[in-house]
């Protein structure tokens, strides 16, 4: 197979614009998948992806069409999984830009297009869902030209659902996507690891793009970053199931198994070469993203701690963006503090741990990384609110800020601007895309975004607004630590860092929520929120009352008083030794506290 017959491309789009459906149609049109094997979301192999209707993991598949070989790398569309997209694009020469004919350009479309431009990819604009009555392809073409700045006059109009014009997409891939540059099978092996996963029988399986050279079964491969070497036991391509081959050559995308048992030996973004003919300089990898949200994961059964550690190591293989370290909590025991790229990322990882590894997890409320400068000049990076230093020792607190670009219709402008103001946002600019659509730019503290901003934005705009963001650095803020006390004892896992102006409202909301979700006991439980020694909110969980006087009838009143006094003493003793069981809902309650509500 000569290089001029190979095409490597990805599909980029905003979530729900029909990316996985288009991938399905391409696989069917090229007979890679027969009609009998076909199903919705063929490349979304994870059960979670099928259920939620989203792509979480990238996937690489080889397609044979006439005398050409295509390598389609499917990418996620949600803002949390941008790192998956950047990995996919590093292995491609072209990208199909898919835009919904009814919704037009959305925030994540733009973010992914800019990533593709950074990688100098050939971009082919495709307008999907033209079969819908509300489709407006001409408006979308104008948007692509005005916002992105690429010629959309020849944009391909398709319906991935019905399969209309899929043949034109295939022809455009052949004509417009460049063949792999300077791929030479005679040079030393030069391959980029863009993904990996763990197989219980074979160990670590690597997904790789071969830029130069070739690799065969039995070759000794060398990882340039981890400096480890292994012998290849199996290799091949996906179409979309694994197909074994004898070798992978320059320009190809495939998988390699080398009986690697230690997950730390493989690093996504590393360069693969041969042990007996090494490269001197590694390939430029993609940029490693810094976690945005930090949360504590604790096993419900403390005996599962080592199982949770093993599960995190295996998931880290294919999800190189998560960072984690052990931590302990008085309330929850031993667990891990984990860094994620966003709340959906956190939600998906928790669900994967519970499904794939049969673990029961308690997740604490998410937090961002605060930079605290102490009066003695020391600087601390705090991701766990319970470790916040004493206020008297703090000179200044800085929190991360973002620049948010929100795409929305005119009718929702007022509501979304009000939401941004409530979240301590600073208005920067508004851009007019066309007669009805606007791009709103705000600077916002990340700590306000990670809780409920996305849900509220969708709610206020009936699902039509979308946003993406970039970090703009740290800024000093007047932040305080709010401790939650149950029965007079601090629950470290419920502590939160909030702006002083919102501390009272958030504390009132949280104590009310905790009162609802914590089960009643045989004694009264005060639920308090405190800043330092000052209590700023309180609710009381009423006790169960056993009617100890029910057996009395008539007789002396002192008998009744004696029984009630005895009950009171029993409850007092129980209160002093009783521990309050805190359910998972209590930790989720922090996510649901809504400072956008107006309090009278």
UniProtKB/Swiss-Prot annotation:
Assigned EC number: 3.6.5.n1
Official protein name in the record: Elongation factor 4
Cysteine pairings via disulfide bonds: none
Gene symbol of the encoding locus: lepA
Single GO molecular function: translation elongation factor activity
Record lineage: Bacteria, Bacillati, Mycoplasmatota, Mycoplasmoidales, Metamycoplasmataceae
Family: Belongs to the TRAFAC class translation factor GTPase superfamily. Classic translation factor GTPase family. LepA subfamily.
Principal location listed in the UniProt entry: membrane
Catalytic function, reaction form: GTP + H2O = GDP + phosphate + H(+)
Any GO CC annotation of this UniProt entry: plasma membrane
Function: Required for accurate and efficient protein synthesis under certain stress conditions. May act as a fidelity factor of the translation reaction, by catalyzing a one-codon backward translocation of tRNAs on improperly translocated ribosomes. Back-translocation proceeds from a post-translocation (POST) complex to a pre-translocation (PRE) complex, thus giving elongation factor G a second chance to translocate the tRNAs correctly. Binds to ribosomes in a GTP-dependent manner.
Keyword Nucleotide-binding: yes
Native species: Metamycoplasma arthritidis (strain 158L3-1)
